[in-house]
Amino acid sequence: MASPKSSTRPNQENQEPQFQDFFPTMAGKLGGEGLIEEICKGFELLMDKDKGVITFESLRRNASTVLGLGDLTDDDVRYMINEGDFDRDGALNQMEFCVLMFRLSPELMEASRCVVTEVIEEEFYRH
């Protein structure tokens, strides 16, 4: 998972948490499927076991105990949930979490864009 640099508190300049991006290294070592498996394991660590989604409460609790991010404010936690909550149900399902993790990694997003472009070009030129 993306890892906080020194704090996840928004900085004054852009008001977004800053993260150190370990995904490209993980992808290189684990491969695509291995990376997805690790992201899914991260989801399981943070989710509410009864509801099967990451809720405000489960993220607040598990970010502190599992990830050691005890200095997160309620606003930090809300921001993290809202950033990936596409269906606006107030929680992150596994797909939303995986998409969010990829969105937080500019290098992986660029690599994905290149792969999609190659596939489209191959299909276009084959027909």
UniProtKB/Swiss-Prot annotation:
Regions of compositional bias (Polar residues) in chain numbering: 1-18
Q: Which Pfam families match?
A: EF-hand_8 (PF13833)
Q: Which InterPro entries match?
A: EF-hand-dom_pair, EF_Hand_1_Ca_BS, EF_hand_dom, KIC/PBP1/KRP1
Name the coiled-coil region(s): none
Gene Ontology biological process terms from the UniProt entry: cellular response to hypoxia; response to auxin
Source organism, top-level taxon: Eukaryota
Recite the UniProt keywords alphabetically.
Calcium, Metal-binding
One GO MF term attached to the UniProt entry: calcium ion binding
Sequence ranges assigned to domain EF-hand in this UniProt record: 72-107
SUPFAM superfamilies linked to this entry: EF-hand
Q: What induces it?
A: By auxin.
Annotated positions binding Ca(2+): D85, D87, D89, E96
Location of region: Disordered:
1-20
Subunit info here reads: Interacts with PID.
- Report the function annotation for this chain: Potential calcium sensor that binds calcium in vitro.
Q: What is this protein called?
A: Calcium-binding protein PBP1
